[in-house]
Amino acid sequence: MKITNPEALMAASISRRSLVKTSAIGSLALASSAFTLPFSRIAHAAADLASGNVAEKAVWSSCTVNCGSRCLLRLHVKDDTVYWVESDTTGNDEYGNHQVRACLRGRSIRRRMNHPDRLKYPMKRVGKRGEGKFERISWDEALDTIGDNLKRILKDYGNEAVHVLYGTGVDGGNITNSNVPYRLMNACGGYLSRYGSYSTAQISAAMSYMFGGNDGNSPDDIANTKLVVMFGNNPAETRMSGGGVTYYVEQARERSNARMIVIDPRYNDTAAGREDEWLPIRPGTDGALAAAIAWVLITEDLIDKPFLDKYCIGYDETTLPASAPRNAHYKAYILGQGDDGIAKTPQWAAQITSIPAEKIIQLAREIGSAKPAYICQGWGPQRHSNGEQTARAIAMLSVLTGNVGINGGNSGVREGTRDLGVEWFSMLENPVKTQISVFTWTDAIDHGAEMTATRDGVRGKDKLDVPIKFLWCYASNTLINQHGDIAHTHEVLQDDSKCEMIVGIEHFMTASAKYCDILLPDLMPTEQEDLISHESAGNMGYVILGQPATSPKFERKPIYWTLSEVAKRLGPDVYQTFTEGRTQHEWVKYLHAKTKARNPEMPDYEEMKQTGIFKKKCPEEHYVAFRAFREDPAANPLKTPSGKIEIYSERLATLANTWELKKDEIIHPLPAYTPGFDGWDDPLRQRYPLQLTGFHYKARTHSSYGNIDVLQQACPQEIWINPIDAQARGIQHGDTVRVFNQNGEMLIPAKVTPRILPGVTAIGQGAWLNADMFGDKVDRGGSINILTSHRPSPLAKGNPSHSNLVQVEKA
């Protein structure tokens, strides 16, 4: 909807009923006890327009943080400043060709661009790492310092001593992307790379062993289903915009009238009146629930046996690999005929999950009798210490019922999307083949030369030769804020004889920026030209041609220029390989031309500068994961050793027998339930009786937008706690409480709400650390990682950031 009459907008009467019916954010707002929208800011913008404060220009751009969406923005500029933001106003906003409208985060982007705390000049550290003490230096000094130190470290330690830290603060662009330092390092011999991500480490690893890849049906395919079952899946907060999934889920359910069941410790915003049933569950126990559902499906003959026989390995003895022990198949495990001798009955699972046995039986019968059924899981359940096993256990429900590879079904993972075929700015090939897990970089700094393949998941060689000595940190708050166990990370980074140089390229003085040795001010993507691709786009792909809204202010520079200048200092061959003789503008035109060659109907470059976005609906109507495999498994085998769905994995059986694992670190050849560490039944609960889980908060994307005042007011940082637990501790809603465990401590307001299971607490991840790390180390900003662990999960060596035990007291 394009605003042409601000007076009419402000005079319009919006009823509570119409807001709830027509707006996802309406449901979201009314479901929350403390959610207020900054309508006064809208009134202010409308007053500007009404007074004739007309923009000198308006340009198309995009919000490119890591929510999984890339929403179109129309930035109105006057006096070289963005003063008003619209979103997508193109087309007729029809289903399948809808407007990619931004959420409140994207719509507040001018507050990020114009924020008084943005970095302005290059700086070097003059205090201890983490103190935030810097002095201004010239660009030449900064670039020379980086170049000299990088050359020294490459000479003294080799390319494996250089690492590019995981970061997603600039994500989704092509050249404006957190990955661009990879290209620079690959142009000069490579670097120690990583596998996995903080988002999906465990599920990606698990699905590679089960399906040979991680893929799901597009959310619009819910139009063809009879039942939607969501395990820890909350797109209404994680992907709530027009570029995300919530729109598709709503539209598809209108067409199918599918029943929707939400399984989550919290009554999340995806439920929030949309669901037919909410089943609250203890964090980390989804695998036990899945096993009990499987028990009902098997004992009541609700499985698709022909599918299991034809497409799968290891359901029963008929398809069990010859290398496996007797009764090592999935059916035996579920029925209690395997090694543990425990039947996975609903009564067994009820004690673990807190879901009553009769509810489990009812859910199992619904899943077994509704075909197709769209069973999916978000990325929350896998972000646990037992996350790999949980992800496989949930996916087994789709496998057992034969819902894989068909319309209206799913593989049991998160929703998939179509690919438009955008040409990407190549990161070049990395000559260094050694890799570490995305989560173990602090270990690689602290004791890298001791890290091995069988204990730490090192890939490409048996052990690391050298620790990390040089760290690139571009648009990344992972250095301290987004990584597990902040206190431990702080101690590792303090010793600058370990990691000798940390280079930060940032927009703000984040918690992580305070630990950098050289800190460079970056232009935001909205201040640059780029070709930006969709991500969570359902069955409609799109690409945005963003233009710079304003000229560079102070001494901020684009990342491409910055790294090109570093490349010059590394040698003319490195510079040529990195740039290929092109400017950023020339690269954008080149990438546009390549993308257009794959999509001939895409507008020419000059035309697209005016239209902003190109949309293309999937020709197959709905994307179906593993469809080709389902139709002809011989011609289209999966990327597993057998070419089939591997319920029993011989590769995992080998790892379980050869890797160095602690007693509570389990790799299993079957999708078996394992409790994990720091879970609901860990002995540590005697000291810290409440489970603490994280969630993705609508006020931020990870830590991006975490310093925007109106979003902080609309969505305050709180700890969710059930009234039963609050009453036992004398806590009332709004009280400041002390949350603590063996890792750290924070002070935070309490949100006392029945929307969370008793015995469980929750904190939205991504809030900015506000602690004196040289003093009491008590966080007052609500950063959950002051409480999380740096111990990785068993298989993926990923972040178990939702497996935490805490105590909560009134402060």
Regions found by a protein language model. Give the residues of each.
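Extended redox/cofactor-interaction regions of prokaryotic respiratory oxidoreductases
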Residues: 2-7, 178-263, 270, 288, ...
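N-terminal export/assembly segments and adjacent metallocofactor-ligating motifs
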Residues: 2-302, 328, 461, 469, ...
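Long, well-ordered, tryptophan-enriched scaffold segments
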Residues: 266-370
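A glycine-rich phosphate-binding loop feature that marks nucleotide/adenosyl-phosphate handling sites
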Residues: 310-313, 367, 410-421, 579-594, ...
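Active-site phosphate/pyrophosphate-binding segments
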Residues: 326-445
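Phosphate/diphosphate-binding loops
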Residues: 500-501, 548-567
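Glycine/threonine-rich phosphate-binding loop and adjacent beta-strand/alpha-helix elements that clamp
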Residues: 526-552, 567-569, 648, 752
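Long, contiguous, secondary-structure-rich segments that constitute the structural scaffold
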Residues: 559-611, 703-705, 709-720, 724-811
